[in-house]
Amino acid sequence: MAFKIASSPHVTRNLQTSTVMQRVILCLLPGLVVQCAFFGWGTLIQVLLAIIVALSCEAAVMKLRKRSIKASLGDNSAMLTAILIGVAIPPLAPWWMIVMGTAFAIVIVKHLYGGLGHNLFNPAMAAYVLLLVSFPLQMTTWIAPSTVALNTPSIVDSLQLIFNVGAHVGMEQFRLGIDGISMATPLDTLKTDLSLGLTTTESMAKSIFDGSTGVGWFWVNLAYLAGGIVLLKLKAIRWHISTGVLAGLFVASSVGFLLSPDTHASPLFHLFSGATMLAAFFIATDPVTAATSPRGRIIFGALIGVLVYIIRTQGGYPDAFAFAVLLANLCAPFIDYYVRPRTYGHSAG
């Protein structure tokens, strides 16, 4: 009788790419719902528009490459990229921005390098940086949270603003911020106030702040944190990168806060402001563009956390996760080279 000899590992989990992507998308939903609750229908509209563009671009590229369109769309990677771009940009950004960013992410960043599993940079963050550098005003003008806004646009108002239709007096007031609909994010506000000589305590006395965090942003981050914990429980991601990101940001912000509390925000503010939890659990954990070994993943995550703090406090862009992730993507091959696991029976290196 002939026996089949199989190499290790002998116990495996049959998790397909589409299954992992589905789990990530489902775990994103709590954060998306809370974000829509505080910042209106615009976020949902941007996400839906991004999904349409992403799937269309994915199908077009697959047709040109003579690959299976059904298989490519079925892995859900394009949809996940679209959702991440949609929740990252301001809710009322013009429609052509989300179209441009999503097309760039799918066609250039993803497929120019060979498609899924071959891209050097995170597609969603590369698209975000393209839009931020090209259109800084539109990318830094966020809608005021519903709890402090004088006016919150309805779904019809949001559609009119995004697609630039219905240019009557009311819509012009919304666009110009006369009704108090738009304002800077807490990170932007704090950075501007500190540059004007205000202390963190004086800056956080403004209505956009709720104690030690930003209004709305604390709950948005908490929702993404909850989704991230479920993602870990489902074993769709590993803990190393997320822990490294949060630990790196916490340690760096703690040092700054202890040395100068008047000019540096608390670690709690940094952890629950901007895209911290979204990036820590759903963006930095991209297995294609991150380091591969367990120790390398921790270093990779910690590098992102430290870079975020440095860019937030010293750079020109307050929410620095996109730049930090892309810089860490560049460093991933070096981390893998110098932090290789030792093969049993051989020396390290």
From Swiss-Prot:
Modification sites for FMN phosphoryl threonine: T185
Cell compartment(s), UniProt: Cell inner membrane
One Pfam family this sequence matches: NQR2_RnfD_RnfE
Primary location recorded for the protein, binned into one broad class: membrane
Membrane topology: Multi-pass membrane protein
Superkingdom field: Bacteria
Cofactor field: FMN
HAMAP family (alphabetical): RsxD_RnfD
Family under the similarity heading: Belongs to the NqrB/RnfD family.
NCBIfam families for the chain: PRK00816.1, rnfD
Stated role: Part of a membrane-bound complex that couples electron transfer with translocation of ions across the membrane.
Name of the protein: Ion-translocating oxidoreductase complex subunit D
Protein source organism: Shewanella oneidensis (strain ATCC 700550 / JCM 31522 / CIP 106686 / LMG 19005 / NCIMB 14063 / MR-1)
